[in-house]
């Protein structure tokens, strides 16, 4: 039998959810049930936390649990940040599948997203992180400053486009 859980210990639990929706409590139960928390209540807390900014987007949520209290914080992926920067109207996930986003974002938006993602990137400089975000833009299907993100990546590599150092 596993050792008894210490309630004063800080435990981080990561859950992938759709913003603004109360996920199935049955999917949360195996992760947070042993910590002495109610999956239904945590599901409602997650829905409340993600309802405003991340409605309809798939985001990772970090639950920090200590003394049977859960603190909810959103850990957005690069794709979620890019889709949010597109400012597209919310779509019903159940009706439309495999959405290709055909919007445009500016290079400044990409640099801002890169600054947010810098701590999770393996790149040494900001230019490398910007290239990673541009690759995400290719996957999402949007253009940057009216150009294909692949072309912009090549221009950064050639030195035609300047990226700030920090």
Curated annotation (Swiss-Prot):
Disulfide-linked positions: none
Cellular component annotations (GO), alphabetically ordered: cytosolic large ribosomal subunit
Record keywords: Ribonucleoprotein, Ribosomal protein, RNA-binding, rRNA-binding
Keyword Ribosomal protein included in the entry's annotation: yes
Organism: Prunus armeniaca
Matches recorded under Pfam families: Ribosomal_L11 (PF00298), Ribosomal_L11_N (PF03946)
Function: This protein binds directly to 26S ribosomal RNA.
GO biological process, one term: translation
SUPFAM superfamilies given in the database record: Ribosomal L11/L12e N-terminal domain, Ribosomal protein L11, C-terminal domain
Protein name per Swiss-Prot or TrEMBL: Large ribosomal subunit protein uL11
Family named by the database record: Belongs to the universal ribosomal protein uL11 family.
Record-level Gene Ontology MF annotations: large ribosomal subunit rRNA binding; structural constituent of ribosome
């Amino acid at each position: 039998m596993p050792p008894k859980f210490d309630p004063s210990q800080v435990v981080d639990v990561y859950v992938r959810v759709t913003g603004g929706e109360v996920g199935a409590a049955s999917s949360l139960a195996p992760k947070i049930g042993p910590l002495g928390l109610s999956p239904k209540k945590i599901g409602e807390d997650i829905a409340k936390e993600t309802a405003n900014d991340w409605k309809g987007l798939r985001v990772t949520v970090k639950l920090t649990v200590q003394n049977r209290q859960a603190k909810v914080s959103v850990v957005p992926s690069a794709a979620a940040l890019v889709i949010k920067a597109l400012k597209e109207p919310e779509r019903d996930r159940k009706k439309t599948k495999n959405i290709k986003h055909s919007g445009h974002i500016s290079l400044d938006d990409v640099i801002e997203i890169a600054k947010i993602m810098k701590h999770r990137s393996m790149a040494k400089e900001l230019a490398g992180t910007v290239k990673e975000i541009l690759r995400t833009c290719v996957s999402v299907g949007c253009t940057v400053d009216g150009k294909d993100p692949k072309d912009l990546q090549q221009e950064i590599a050639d030195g035609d486009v300047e990226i700030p150092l920090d």
